[in-house]
C-alpha cells in the first residue's frame, strides 16, 4: 500500500533526525511521528494544536522560533500546491484576490518553509494539479537550502537540492507519474533505486501506533 510506504518512510526520516518537537498536520503525519518514537526517537514531543504538547514543555512564546532556527523542530505538511522551486501554497487555487477555491490559509508555512529545521511535503497524489511550475499564491517562500526539504509522493522520495528536485528513490511506476507532471521537473539519476515497501521495523511501528489503519484513508486506501 502506498500509504504504508509513505507513512513508514516519513517515520524513518523523523527517527533519523535529532529534532525535539514534531508538528503533525494530518492523521498520517501524526501516525508517522508516533512510529518514529518506537524507531528510536523516544523523547520526541508532538505539538498537536494550541492546547496540547505531548512531552515536557515550557510556556514561552518564542520557543518555537528558537527551535526552528536551531533545526530542532520538524514539520510535515500537505500543500495544496508545491512548485519546482519549493514554494508552497495553502491558501487558494486561482488568481490572488479572486481564487476559484479559497482554503485554510498559510498558517505557519511562512515561518517554516525556509529554516534550518527539516520539512517534509507529503502528498497523496503525484498530480500536475498539486505539483506545479509556480504556485498560485506563495505561502512559503522558496527554501534557501538551510535545512532538509523532502517530498514524499506515490512516485517516490525527492530532495530539494540547490533549487532543483532530485530523486532519492522511486516507487513502482514512479517514472510514469513524474512524466505526468512536466511543470515539476525531477532529476532521476541513472541507477536510482526503486522502493516498493518500507522496512519491517517501520511497518511494525505503524501497526503498533495505528492498529486501525487510520493513516491509509489519507491515501484513499484501507
Language model: regions and residue ranges:
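Conserved phosphate- and dinucleotide-binding cores of soluble alpha/beta proteins
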Residues: 53-185, 189-204
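Short, Lys/Arg-enriched charge-dense amphipathic segments
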Residues: 40-48, 102-105, 210-222
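N-terminal active-site beta-alpha-beta segment that forms phosphate/nucleotide-binding
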Residues: 1-61
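Intrinsically disordered, low-complexity segments enriched in small residues
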Residues: 1-23, 30, 147-148, 152-165, ...
Amino acid at each position: 500500500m502506498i500509504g504504508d510506504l509513505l507513512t513508514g518512510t516519513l517515520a524513518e526520516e523523523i527517527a533519523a533526525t535529532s529534532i525535539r518537537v514534531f508538528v503533525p498536520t494530518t492523521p498520517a503525519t501524526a501516525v508517522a511521528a508516533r512510529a518514529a518514537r518506537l524507531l528510536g526517537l523516544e523523547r520526541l514531543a508532538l505539538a498537536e494544536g494550541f492546547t496540547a504538547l505531548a512531552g515536557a514543555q515550557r510556556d514561552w512564546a518564542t520557543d518555537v522560533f528558537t527551535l526552528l532556527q536551531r533545526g530542532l523542530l520538524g514539520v510535515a505538511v500537505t500543500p495544496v500546491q508545491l512548485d519546482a522551486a519549493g514554494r508552497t501554497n495553502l491558501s487558494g487555487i486561482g488568481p490572488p484576490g479572486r481564487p476559484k477555491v479559497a482554503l485554510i490559509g498559510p498558517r505557519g508555512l511562512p515561518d517554516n518553509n525556509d529554516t534550518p529545521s527539516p520539512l517534509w511535503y507529503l502528498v497523496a497524489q503525484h498530480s500536475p494539479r498539486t505539483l506545479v511550475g509556480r504556485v498560485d499564491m506563495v505561502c512559503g517562500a522558496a527554501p534557501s537550502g538551510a535545512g532538509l526539504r523532502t517530498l514524499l509522493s506515490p512516485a517516490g522520495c525527492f530532495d530539494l537540492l540547490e533549487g532543483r528536485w532530485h530523486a532519492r528513490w522511486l516507487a513502482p511506476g514512479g517514472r510514469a507519474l513524474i512524466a505526468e507532471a512536466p511543470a515539476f521537473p525531477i532529476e532521476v539519476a541513472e541507477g536510482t533505486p526503486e522502493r516498493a515497501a518500507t522496512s519491517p521495523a517501520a511497518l511494525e511501528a505503524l501497526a503498533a501506533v495505528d492498529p486501525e489503519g487510520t493513516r491509509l484513508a489519507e491515501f484513499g486506501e484501507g
